[in-house]
Amino acid sequence: MAVSDADASSVDKVESITLQRVKQSEELLAQLYVVEESPRRMGRGPVQLMLAISVLSLVAFITTLLMRYNAFVTMYEDAQAKRSNFEVMIQRRDNLFGNLVKLTLNHAALEHSIFSHTSDKRKESVEAGKGGPIGSAIEQLMKQGGIGKLLGDGGAGKALLGADGGFGNALGRLMAIVEQYPTVQSADTYKHMMTSLVDMEDRIASKREEFNASAATYNVAITKWPWDYLAMITGFKRVEYFHEKPAGDTPIITPQIFQELLPLTHSQESKN
């Protein structure tokens, strides 16, 4: 029994020594192969997403600036085009005003000349041939509608032309003028002139309103924040409006112009 106990104790010692050696070996191996845990790296997904968002934002910003710049150009050119149309209407009025007034006044002077000479000859004929065929015919025509019927009625005019040679020659020249200008009516001519002038002024007012509306749209666009900085950098400036002056720029017929526009009257005065 003593031998068996000694053997058992020796076996236990051997096992304990073996366990100690195994632990020492594990510790040595652990010191030799130390496992270092590396810090976790941020994944590439969030970085790429942030980069994509930044690029898209930059592209959208540049695109917006370019579109706004093009809008400025479009509005500015539209305002300039309507300004040009307004100035064309002003120039058209200036060009037509004098000619239109001259034509109307000459028309009236022609009518005045025709009826003035006709009236003079009528008086001379009536005084020279009272009770005769010419005087009776003229008095009858006056009762029926005046000398206008004489000039408009070819039969009556020819009858009087054959009745008196002197009066016939003068009246023949007047009838030739009437045949050349068959619708000499100064009242209608003046009415047409006034209608034309009013129409021109209405067109000018319409063009001025169109330009001012276009200029207002452009001015508001370049003065709104933050686009006023873009307009300042790119050189876009405000467009001035057209305002009607108190006195107006409409041409007026002065006494000097009225006298200059009556060449027939001047020629008659120079002859007299």
Curated annotation (Swiss-Prot):
Lumenal side: 68-272
Family designation: Belongs to the LemA family.
Species this protein is from: Magnetospirillum gryphiswaldense (strain DSM 6361 / JCM 21280 / NBRC 15271 / MSR-1)
Protein name as catalogued: Magnetosome protein MamQ
Transmembrane segments: 47-67
Entry-linked SUPFAM superfamilies: LemA-like (SSF140478)
Upper taxonomic lineage: Bacteria, Pseudomonadati, Pseudomonadota, Alphaproteobacteria, Rhodospirillales
Protein purpose: Essential for magnetosome formation. Not essential for formation of magnetosome membrane vesicles. One of 7 genes (mamLQBIEMO) able to induce magnetosome membrane biogenesis; coexpression of mamLQRBIEMO in a deletion of the 17 gene mamAB operon restores magnetosome vesicle formation but not magnetite biosynthesis.
Transmembrane in keyword set: yes
